[in-house]
Design a protein with these regions (language model features):
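Iron-sulfur cluster-binding electron-transfer modules in prokaryotic oxidoreductases
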Residues: 1-260
Length: 260
């Protein structure tokens, strides 16, 4: 496991997770990253409102999906957490969930129904909802971009055409890499905690593919964004798709400089 410190605690974690829910610790991000993610959430909220989507928010009752717990193979902890999340949603009368990232989309839409009997909540990514509404750009983009498709969105949830439709309608010119859509290449994120060296190697290879196509790279996943930004050359901007869409579709969004 290379030199990753987290592996020193796996044996302890296997025992502790039976009595303590560790999902919150696994999901925690750094303050700088958190500010970036918060801005992306504001972008998404503005986009949905501009498209006429009526939605609410559960605040403290908006629980983490448990995606990382699932990926780590902590089955008992994940199942208990999934039931907690589902019960919370049902107790608040939720019939449809709008997700903001690929991992949550996949866990709620494809995994929960397999482990929770009678799961009956509709789950859609905000990108799917926006693509259905086909909003008009109020401030068209004049930019050339390349898309890094999320492995989970593209291969498991069939979210491939929607982001392209939204970017094209926003005025962006898309330059596709050879490995795009369902043939997308990994950002290295799944390896980060156990094999940081290999993760950086994978991310660097992917970044080389992307930067050869365009100077602006569009991501749709916070893990992809973090890993690719870390290895991006100075002349390449790596930004979340919500940044571009908010600039084009939301009239009150200030145009921001490329976030490298």
């Amino acid at each position: 496991f290379e030199d990753s410190w987290i592996t020193n605690y796996f044996a302890i974690g296997r025992g502790v997770n039976k009595v303590i829910n560790l999902s919150g610790l696994l999901a925690r991000s750094q303050p700088v990253e958190q500010r970036t993610y918060d801005e992306h959430l504001r972008n998404i909220a503005r986009l949905l409102k501009s498209a006429g989507v009526d939605f609410g928010y559960l605040y403290d009752n908006d629980l983490y999906s448990g995606a990382l717990v699932y990926d780590e193979g902590l089955d008992d902890t994940f199942l208990a957490h999934a039931r907690l999340v589902y019960d919370m949603l049902k107790s608040n009368g939720v019939k449809q969930v709008i997700t903001v990232d690929p991992h949550t989309t996949n866990i709620l839409r494809s995994v929960y129904p397999k482990v929770i009997g009678g799961f009956d909540i509709q789950v859609k990514s905000y990108l799917e909802l926006l693509a259905e509404r086909r909003p008009d750009a109020v401030r068209p983009l004049d930019i050339e971009v390349t898309i890094h498709d999320s492995c989970i969105y593209a291969r498991h949830e069939d979210v491939v055409d929607q982001p392209r439709l939204l970017l094209k309608q926003a005025g962006a010119v898309i330059q596709e890499t050879e490995q795009s859509g369902k043939l997308t290449y990994c950002c290295g994120g799944p390896l980060e905690s156990l094999f940081p060296g290999k993760a950086e190697e994978v991310a660097s290879k992917r970044m080389a593919q992307l930067s050869d196509c365009a100077g602006c790279v569009v991501t749709m996943c916070p893990i992809c964004l973090s890993n690719l930004k870390r290895v991006a050359p100075p002349e390449t901007a790596v930004r979340d798709i919500s940044d571009y869409l908010a600039e084009a579709y939301c009239p009150n969004t200030n145009k921001s400089p490329a976030n490298k």
